[in-house]
Amino acid sequence: MKIAAFVSLLMVMKKLEIQRRAENHRRKRILPLSGMQTPDAVKTVLSQPRRLEELLDMLGDKELSIRSRAAAALARLAESHPESLLKAMPRLREHIHDDSDYVRWHLIYAFGEIGACVSSSTREFLSDVFVGMEDSSRVVRMIAGKAAARLAAKRPDDIAAFFREVQRPVPPELAKYLPEGPEGNAN
């Protein structure tokens, strides 16, 4: 009887050791987001929200390919789950002047997506998009214009107020969304 109990205890201990090793092995195999393609990185962040911080950290990497991958994943995340990036806006804003056009246009695109889907005012997002509208890159300006149009379609009053505030005329492509029309917004 004592031998059977001892053997049984050994078997339980062995099973626990195997489970512990398997768990440690699984933890060690976490693939960094920087090594993933955009769709996989987005799926990972959605299933493990605390990894968003890792994605945001990638924006500050010295390697352009890593920053680009992060920006593309954040733009895709903004399309499907914009609310998940609301708290990350200050971190995203830190990188709006990145050296890479690719990174900048993805971030501007993300600002437009997030701003168009929030229930509060879009004015804070407009200032970010406005930075893109004055960018040296034609592609960034084009993406910023589309993002601003998306915001204008959602909240035309915010657009009018923003351009009054910055004392600039409303661009014609945005004026068509405003209640008083292009002629009333020439400033």
Language model features with spans:
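A positional/architectural concept
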Residues: 48-76
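Structural signature of alpha-helical solenoid repeat scaffolds
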Residues: 75, 112, 149-150, 183
